[in-house]
Amino acid sequence: TLRVVLDDPEAMESFTHAPGQVGQLSVFGAGESPFVINSPPSRKDYLQFSVMQAGEVTAAIHRLSPGDKVGVRAPLGNFFPYNDWKGKDIFFVGGGIGMAPIRTIMLHLLEHKADYGKISLLYGARSPRDMAFSYELEDWLRRPDLDCTLCIDAPFEGWEHKVGLIPNVLLELNPD
């Protein structure tokens, strides 16, 4: 997870984005890549990005230290049409680092829960160690206003949730 604070406090305070939009992060000397802004729009003190190390730019991001400078162009791209979802039940399905954009919209919907119907999440990963945002998932499992189902691909000692591939667990849940 990378947290970015803009140099200009006024720009940071006035920055707006919608759930699902991305930011183009530039690491000087390494290049640039787009990443989902996964802090909720209500967060005004920093922008958060989840970066899985997979290439030169992401490796450079993983080598950053607090206070290092990066370039940011944001917000970019489309966003979730959450205003169209008001009053409706919503079911999210995601896996691995694909949780990054889902997390953003989930945080927004949970902040405005009264505007939406039932919110459900099916999230899976290869193993418990591969679960993104595990600290929040534990909180979400305890929320009475959220139906959260977690799964991993294969049995793992101590795992108390579903075991199986996401499509198979989805069939088992049989959402309407």
Which sequence ranges carry the predicted segments?
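FNR/FR-type flavoprotein reductase catalytic core
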Residues: 56-176
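Ferredoxin-reductase
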Residues: 1-68, 125-127, 153-155
